[in-house]
Amino acid sequence: MMPVDVCPRDRGSQWVWLEMGQCYSKKSVVPESDTSERSSMTSGSSESDIPQENKVSKASLDTGQMAFTLAQLESLEICLKEAEEKAKALSEQLSVSEGTKSKLLEQVSRLEEKLEAVDHKEASGGPYEKMVLVKDQCIQKLQAEVKASQEQLIAQKLKHEKKVKKLQTDLATANAITVLELNEKIKTLYEGKPAPREDSLLEGFCGGLPPVEEGDRKISLIMELSTQVSLQTERITQLKEVLEEKERKIQQLEAERSPHPPQEVKDPPGCLPEAPVFSTHDIPPVVSDENL
């Protein structure tokens, strides 16, 4: 509220009260010739009118001041209502902002946790990658060994089949020669003639040896061939066992590699035992008819 003062009266001036609560003075200029007359004429009446004028001016001042005060109160009430509405809207906006801030803080905390988990995973991924690399190297080595063993086994099988076929042919030939000799001996015994010392078939096959020595040599040849066949069969069985063992190890490593979590590598890349590799030099040569 603006202060309202009652304007005083000065000598030679008149104060006027306006609606806005301010006082202004209006000076009146009187000529010098009329001053003495007017003062003498109005001296008596002015002294009697002063209290009445003061009452009227005070009443008018009180009425204007009251109206001005009421207008100010109404304007202040309107301003107060507007301020309350603005404060209410601001409080609502503040509550919404607080809720948004809490949600953002929760999102930030979740993102920080995810970032820490990713950092931890990257930090712990080094040993796992090394272990996977070592296992891959072991698997590749085993696969190469299995491939070499398979190739060697196939070659040994082919060679063994050839030797078996040759032995079967030689055995059939020896049996046929023995049957022919026995038939000749039986025939000569029935006819009563002495058995010939040499035969054309025996000369071509045995080089003219006596029948008794030739039969012993055939028997020894058959025994030696049977021994070689049994040795080769044992070697082939051993190669098959080694191949099956390597395949089991490869399957075990592949099963450990894919579904399970990373584990510590206890053995170096050379942890797996070396599989025995059989060469063709270990197999004894087959005695054929050309060596006889």
UniProtKB/Swiss-Prot annotation:
Residues 65-174, 222-258 form a coiled coil. The keyword NADP does not apply. The keyword Coiled coil applies. Keywords: Coiled coil. Residues 251-267 have a biased composition (Basic and acidic residues). Residues 28-55, 251-292 are annotated as: Disordered. Residues 38-49 have a biased composition (Low complexity). This is Coiled-coil domain-containing protein 192. It comes from Homo sapiens. The gene is CCDC192.
